[in-house]
Amino acid sequence: MILVIGSEKGGCGKSTLAINLVVMSAREGIDTLLVDADIQGSCNEFSQRRDELAIAPRIQVMMKQGRNLHRELADLQHRYQRIIVDTGGRDSAELRSSLLVAQTVLLPVQPTQLDLWATEKAFQITATAQDLNPSLQTYVVITRAHTNLLVTTARDAMQFLSEFPHVRLCHTILYERLAWQKSILEGRSVVELRDTKAYTEMKLLYEEIFDGGIPQVETDPKP
């Protein structure tokens, strides 16, 4: 399968999500390729860092850009069990091209009004892609949510996003935690650290995306 992770706005943790999903897939023994289609090359840098530290399992990363990305992905999907594509935090040729052959697109969004407005534009892009690729499923996940229970922005964002019928809103919320930054510096995913809350959040999201499951345990916003 091909999973595209995209966004209309940077800073939502898009590359971090791609990295964690590919490491988790590799740890399950799934032959997975991470395609870094973002000119910033963050996923490729992470892969090099992980290789330098000799951390197993090794993840496979290719850098691919351009409006013909869909053709390359169509060829690569016959060689790998799973392909995860990290596109830039904007409306790009790579995002639109990859959606032509993807089965799933995951849109991370921070619970701020500016991010929600940008995500509405992303929904328009995925809806257009579905006209050409009817099997494409659109998921959206709240990221970098505040851990303070008195801050209701995540709940408000969930309510707003639930009003889009062609989009599947993930039940899992990813909260802002130091573990996300620490894991990247160490060349690891959060599931390879001893942060049980970040681990639980990522595990539940993984199950929602790849297993189609609905989490039975709500994530805990407390630090």
Predicted regions and their residues:
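P-loop/Walker-type NTP enzyme "switch/lid" segment
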Residues: I2-E8, C12, N20-G89, A93, ...
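Walker A/P-loop
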Residues: S15
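Conserved ATPase-coupling elements of RecA-like P-loop NTPase cores
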Residues: E45, S92-S98, L116-A118
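Inter-motif core of Ras-like GTPase G domains
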Residues: E94-Q113
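Beta-strand-loop-alpha "switch" segments that mediate conformational coupling across diverse proteins
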Residues: R144, M158-R188
